[in-house]
C-alpha cells in the first residue's frame, strides 16, 4: 500500500518559522483523532511500508525497541517526535513491546490511495484500528511459545454476595474454560492457569479486598467497564458470539461464571474488532477435581519454572519428552493441575503402560508425530485473517500424519483413553483433506500476497494466467509464427515499446500484403508508418496484450480467492480439526511419558482413595537427571512411608533431622514431586509407590523475603505456615522445612514445636517436617503418629561425609561448622566458630567479651586476629612461664581446673 503524496504536507508547511502558527497536516490530524480513541495503547500508524509512531508513543517505543527517534513537523511550536518499524518486520517489534507490557493498536490503511484521490487531491487515505494487540490475545506464530498456552483470563463477580468465578481462553487454540473460585483461592487459581493477561471489572480492580491479589499476580491486569461483566446480559452475548439460539447445550453456569464468560468474550470482541476467533464452548471445571497447590508451593517446588524464572531446572523440563507443541502444552497443563480422581488417573496410567508394552508402535507413532505442525494455532490464525498458505499447509500435513497414526493403531487393542483418541483422529474430514492435497503446492510461501501456493492444474484459469505471466515471450513467439504463416512475410516481427505496447512490424516493401484486401485491412489495423516500416495490431494481439498486462494481478486474485475458499472450509471443520489435534496431543503425552519411564527407570504408581503414602527407593526426578548429565555419583534413593499405622487411622508425620547439606530439602521435595507426577498420570522415580490421593499439597521449603510488600523472611515464613495450618486436612500432604529459623532460637523452637503438634492433632495430615531443633525429637514420645528420621553422615578426620541416606532415629548435631569450612569461610572464622560451638555445647554461654561475643561474633574474630601472637617455645614463652609458675602441691582441685582452662587458652591463642 502507498500513501498519497499530500499526506505528509509540503516541506515548507512543516518547517514554518516557530513564531508563526503551524497548522497540522491532514495526515497528522487524522493520527491525533485515532490516537485519542486509543490512549492506553501505542499506536502503530500505517504509512506505506512502515508503521509510524508519533509524540509520546514515539519516545516510549524508540526506547523500548532501541530504534532511532527522529522528528516530523511541528505541533504547538515543538518538534513532533517520530519513529517507525517496517511492516514486514512488525511481528518482531510487537513481540518485544508485548514482552515489556505494552498494548499496541494496529492502524491500517483501509482504502486504496486511488480511491482517496477521487474525493479530492488533498484527501487523506482512510485509516482505522483493525486490532488491539495485548499479551492475552496473541495469535501470530512469532509472538507465541509453541510449548506454552497463552491464556486470557477474566474474573467475574456478582453484586450483593460478591461470588467470584474465572474464565480463561487461549484464542490461539480456542481453549475455553470456566470455574468458580473464592477470595481465599483466587490467587492460587490464577497462578495455576498462569494467564498472560487478567481482565477485571474496573469496580473490582479498585476493590481494597481484591487489589492485593492483583498486585501479587504480577501479570498484565486490565480493568474494563463493569458493563462487560453483566451476568444478566451474558447469555445474549454468548449466544451472539457462538451464533446459537439457546445455551441449553452448553450446560449450567452460575451467575459469577456467566459474568466471567461475558467479560472474556467482550474483551476478545473489543481487541479483535472485526474478527471473531472460533472458540470451543466453555468447559466447566468442578471444584476438587484437581490437586490444590498454592502459589508458594508451586514456586518452591519449581514445577514449571525455577525460582529464578527459568524453564531449565524445573520439573516440567525434566519430564518433557513430547515432540509436538500441542503435546507440550497438554503435558504442562497436566503437571500444573494433577487429578484427584483415582479412576481418571488410572486411565492416564493405562495409556502410558500400553506404550511401554508396545515400544515398536510407540517409536513409529512418535516418528509421525514429529512432523505434526500446530494445527489449532494455524486454524485460529486462518479464522481471524492473519493466516497464510503455510497455515493451510500445516493442516494438510497434520491430516496426513493423523491418517498414518490412525492406520498404525487401527487393529491395536487400546486402553480407553487412547481408543477415544484414535476415534477422534479417524474422524478427520476426508473430503477436506483431499481438497487441500489437490489445491496446495508442495512449496508454500509465508505470505498469501506472494502467490504461488496453488498447485498447477487445480484451476484452469489460474494456469492460463500463470502461462501468460511466466511465458509471455513464448506465447508472443507462437502468435508471430501464426502471422508469418498467414501473410507469407518471413520478416514479420511482433515488438513492444512503452508507447504502442505490442505491435506487428513489417518492412515498407511488405506492407501491401497487410492492406491489399478488405479482409486484410479489417484484420490488421494500422498503427504507425515509419520511413522503412509499417506497424499494425490485431484484435487478438490487443486482447493478448491486455491479458499479459493483467495476468499477474489476475493470477494473484484467483489464488487469493482459492485461499479464502480453503480457509472458509477449514473453519467450518474447526470442531473436528481441534478434536483430532487434541487426540494427537494425548498420544504425544502418553508416548512421551512412556519414553521417560523407560529411559529413567520409573515405576507405575498405585493411586487409590486410601491415606497411604509409601514410596520405596524414591528419587528426585530433576536432581537425578542433573547428576547423570554431570557423570557424578548416582542419586541415593530413599524410602518414605507416611501411611496410617493402623486401619482407619490418619497419615503419619516424619520429623527429619540431620546435617546441613545432608539432603533434607531434596528428600522433602522429591516426595512432593512424586505425588504430583503420580496424580498427573505419570510413572514416578521410585522402586514402588502407593499413594492415597492427595487433595491439597503444601510446601514450605526455602527462605526469601518480600521487600516490595515490606515483609521480612521470617514474616513470609510465618504467613505461609499460617496458610498451611489453616487449610490442610487429613488428605493433604504437607512439606515443611526449617520452620522458625528466622527468629531467636527459643522463639523458633517454640513455634516449630507448636506447629508439629497442630499438624498432628488438628490437621491430622501426612507430613514431612525437617528441623535443626533437635529438642523436637522428644515429641515422638508424645505424638503417636510422629516418627524420627535422620540423614546419615560419617565423620572422618575432622571432616564429614554426607551419605544422603534417610534412616530411623534422630541426629544430635547439624555439622554446620564443617559445612561452613567446605563453603570456603576463612580458617580463622571456622576455628572461632568451632570454639564458640564447644563453649555453647558445654553450657558456657557467659563470660568475658573477648571469650564470647554473642551479638557480634565476627568482631571477636577480628580481636582474635589482631592480638599479638603468643610465644609458645623457649624459656621466655608465655606458656613456659605460666607452667613454671605452677606449684602443683599447693593447688586445690578447683584451682587446678581453672589453671587447665587458662593453659588451654594460652595454647589456643598461639
From Swiss-Prot:
Q: Which UniProt keywords apply?
A: ATP-binding, DNA damage, DNA repair, DNA-binding, Nucleotide-binding
Q: State the CDD domains in the record.
A: ABC_MutS1 (cd03284)
Which Gene3D superfamilies does the UniProt record give?
1.10.1420.10, 6.10.140.430, DNA repair protein MutS, domain I, MutS, connector domain, P-loop containing nucleotide triphosphate hydrolases
Question: What's any one GO cellular component for it?
Answer: cytosol
The organism's superkingdom is given as Bacteria
Q: Does the keyword Nucleotide-binding apply?
A: yes
| A Gene Ontology BP annotation from the UniProt entry | mismatch repair
Q: Name one GO molecular function term.
A: ATP-dependent DNA damage sensor activity
**Pfam families per UniProt:** MutS_I (PF01624), MutS_II (PF05188), MutS_III (PF05192), MutS_IV (PF05190), MutS_V (PF00488)
| Residues holding ATP | 658-665
Family assignment from sequence similarity: Belongs to the DNA mismatch repair MutS family.
This chain's function reads:
This protein is involved in the repair of mismatches in DNA. It is possible that it carries out the mismatch recognition step. This protein has a weak ATPase activity.
Can you say what this protein is called?
DNA mismatch repair protein MutS
Gene encoding the protein: mutS
Amino acid at each position: 500500500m502507498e500513501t498519497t503524496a499530500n499526506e505528509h504536507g509540503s516541506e515548507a508547511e512543516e518547517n514554518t518559522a516557530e513564531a508563526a502558527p503551524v497548522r497540522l497536516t491532514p495526515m497528522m490530524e487524522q493520527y491525533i483523532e485515532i490516537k485519542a480513541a486509543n490512549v492506553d495503547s501505542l499506536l502503530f500508524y500505517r504509512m506505506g511500508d512502515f508503521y509510524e509512531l508519533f509524540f509520546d508513543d514515539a519516545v516510549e517505543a524508540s526506547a523500548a525497541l532501541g530504534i532511532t527517534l527522529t522528528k516530523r513537523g511541528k505541533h504547538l511550536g515543538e518538534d513532533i517526535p517520530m519513529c517507525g518499524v517496517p511492516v514486514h518486520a512488525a511481528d518482531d517489534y510487537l513481540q518485544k513491546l508485548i514482552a515489556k507490557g505494552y498494548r499496541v493498536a494496529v492502524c491500517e490503511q483501509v482504502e486504496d490511495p486511488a480511491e482517496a484521490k477521487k474525493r479530492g487531491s488533498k484527501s487523506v487515505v482512510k485509516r482505522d484500528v483493525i486490532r488491539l494487540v495485548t499479551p492475552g490475545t496473541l495469535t501470530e506464530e512469532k509472538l507465541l511459545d509453541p510449548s506454552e498456552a497463552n491464556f486470557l483470563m477474566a474474573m467475574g463477580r456478582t453484586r450483593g454476595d460478591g461470588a467470584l468465578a474465572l474464565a480463561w481462553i487461549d484464542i490461539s487454540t480456542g481453549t475455553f474454560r470456566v470455574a468458580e473460585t473464592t477470595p481465599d483461592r483466587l490467587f492460587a487459581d490464577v497462578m495455576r492457569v498462569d494467564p498472560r493477561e487478567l481482565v477485571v471489572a474496573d469496580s473490582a480492580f479498585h476493590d481494597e479486598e481484591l487489589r492485593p491479589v492483583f498486585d501479587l499476580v504480577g501479570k498484565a491486569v486490565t480493568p474494563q467497564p463493569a458493563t462487560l461483566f453483566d451476568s444478566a446480559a451474558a447469555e445474549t452475548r454468548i449466544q451472539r458470539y457462538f451464533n446459537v439460539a439457546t445455551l441449553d447445550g452448553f450446560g449450567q453456569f452460575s451467575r459469577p461464571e456467566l459474568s466471567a464468560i461475558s467479560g472474556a468474550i467482550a474483551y476478545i470482541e473489543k481487541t479483535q474488532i472485526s474478527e471473531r476467533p472460533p472458540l470451543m464452548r466453555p468447559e466447566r471445571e468442578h471444584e476438587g477435581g484437581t490437586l490444590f497447590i498454592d502459589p508458594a508451593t508451586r514456586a518452591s517446588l519449581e514445577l514449571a519454572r525455577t525460582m529464578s524464572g527459568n524453564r531449565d531446572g524445573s520439573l516440567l523440563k525434566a519430564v518433557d519428552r513430547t515432540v509436538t507443541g500441542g503435546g507440550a502444552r497438554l503435558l504442562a497443563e497436566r503437571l500444573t493441575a494433577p487429578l484427584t480422581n483415582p479412576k481418571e488417573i488410572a486411565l492416564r496410567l493405562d495409556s502410558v503402560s500400553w506404550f511401554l508394552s508396545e515400544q515398536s508402535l510407540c517409536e513409529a507413532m512418535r516418528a509421525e508425530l514429529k512432523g505434526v505442525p500446530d494445527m489449532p494455532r494455524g486454524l485460529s490464525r486462518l479464522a481471524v485473517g492473519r493466516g497464510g498458505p503455510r497455515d493451510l499447509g500445516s493442516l494438510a500435513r497434520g491430516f496426513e500424519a493423523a491418517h498414518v497414526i490412525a492406520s498404525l493403531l487401527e487393529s491395536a487393542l487400546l486402553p480407553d483413553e487412547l481408543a477415544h483418541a484414535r476415534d477422534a483422529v479417524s474422524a478427520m474430514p476426508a473430503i477436506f483433506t483431499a481438497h487441500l492435497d489437490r489445491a496446495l503446492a508442495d512449496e508454500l510461501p509465508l505470505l498469501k500476497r506472494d502467490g504461488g501456493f496453488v498447485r498447477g492444474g487445480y484451476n484452469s484459469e489460474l494456469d492460463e494466467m500463470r502461462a501468460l505471466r511466466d511465458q509471455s515471450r513464448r506465447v508472443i513467439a507462437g502468435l508471430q509464427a501464426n502471422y508469418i504463416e498467414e501473410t507469407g512475410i518471413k520478416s514479420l516481427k511482433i515488438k513492444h515499446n512503452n508507447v504502442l505496447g505490442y505491435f506487428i512490424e513489417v518492412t515498407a516493401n511488405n506492407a501491401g500484403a497487410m492492406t491489399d484486401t478488405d479482409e486484410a485491412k479489417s484484420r490488421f489495423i494500422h498503427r504507425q508508418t515509419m520511413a522503412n516500416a509499417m506497424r499494425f495490431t490485431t484484435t487478438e494481439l490487443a486482447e493478448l496484450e491486455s491479458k499479459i498486462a493483467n495476468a499477474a494481478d489476475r493470477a494473484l486474485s484467483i489464488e487469493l480467492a482459492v485461499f479464502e475458499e480453503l480457509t472458509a472450509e477449514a473453519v467450518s471443520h474447526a470442531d473436528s480439526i481441534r478434536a483430532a489435534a487434541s487426540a494427537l496431543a494425548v498420544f504425544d503425552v502418553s508416548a512421551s511419558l512412556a519414553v521417560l519411564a523407560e529411559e529413567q527407570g520409573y515405576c507405575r504408581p498405585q493411586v487409590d482413595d486410601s491415606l497411604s503414602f509409601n514410596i520405596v527407593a524414591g528419587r528426585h526426578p530433576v536432581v537425578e537427571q542433573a547428576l547423570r548429565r554431570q557423570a557424578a555419583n548416582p542419586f541415593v534413593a530413599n524410602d518414605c512411608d507416611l501411611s496410617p499405622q493402623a486401619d482407619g487411622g490418619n497419615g503419619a508425620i516424619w520429623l527429619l533431622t540431620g546435617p546441613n547439606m545432608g539432603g533434607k530439602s531434596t528428600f522433602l521435595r522429591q516426595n512432593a514431586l512424586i505425588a504430583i507426577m503420580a496424580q498427573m498420570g505419570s510413572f514416578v522415580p521410585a522402586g514402588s509407590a502407593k499413594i492415597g490421593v492427595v487433595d491439597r499439597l503444601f510446601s514450605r521449603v526455602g527462605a526469601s523475603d518480600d521487600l516490595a510488600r515490606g515483609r521480612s523472611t521470617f514474616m513470609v515464613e510465618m504467613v505461609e505456615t499460617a496458610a498451611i495450618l489453616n487449610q490442610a486436612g487429613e488428605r493433604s500432604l504437607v512439606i515443611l522445612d526449617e520452620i522458625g529459623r528466622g527468629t531467636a532460637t527459643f522463639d523458633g523452637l517454640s513455634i516449630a514445636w507448636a506447629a508439629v503438634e497442630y499438624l498432628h492433632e488438628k490437621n491430622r495430615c501426612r507430613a514431612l517436617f525437617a528441623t535443626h531443633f533437635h529438642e523436637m525429637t522428644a515429641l515422638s514420645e508424645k505424638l503417636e503418629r510422629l516418627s524420627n528420621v535422620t540423614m546419615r553422615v560419617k565423620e572422618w578426620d575432622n571432616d564429614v561425609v554426607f551419605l544422603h541416606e534417610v534412616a530411623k532415629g534422630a541426629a544430635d548435631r547439624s555439622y554446620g561448622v564443617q559445612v561452613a569450612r567446605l563453603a570456603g569461610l576463612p580458617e580463622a572464622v571456622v576455628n572461632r566458630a568451632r570454639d564458640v560451638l564447644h563453649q555453647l555445647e558445654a553450657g558456657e554461654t557467659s563470660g568475658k567479651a573477648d571469650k564470647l561475643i554473642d551479638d557480634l561474633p565476627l568482631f571477636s574474630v577480628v580481636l582474635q586476629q589482631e592480638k599479638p601472637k603468643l610465644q609458645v617455645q623457649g624459656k621466655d614463652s608465655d606458656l613456659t612461664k605460666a607452667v613454671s609458675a605452677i606449684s602443683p602441691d599447693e593447688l586445690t582441685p578447683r584451682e587446678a581446673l581453672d589453671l587447665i582452662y587458662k593453659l588451654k587458652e594460652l595454647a589456643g591463642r598461639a
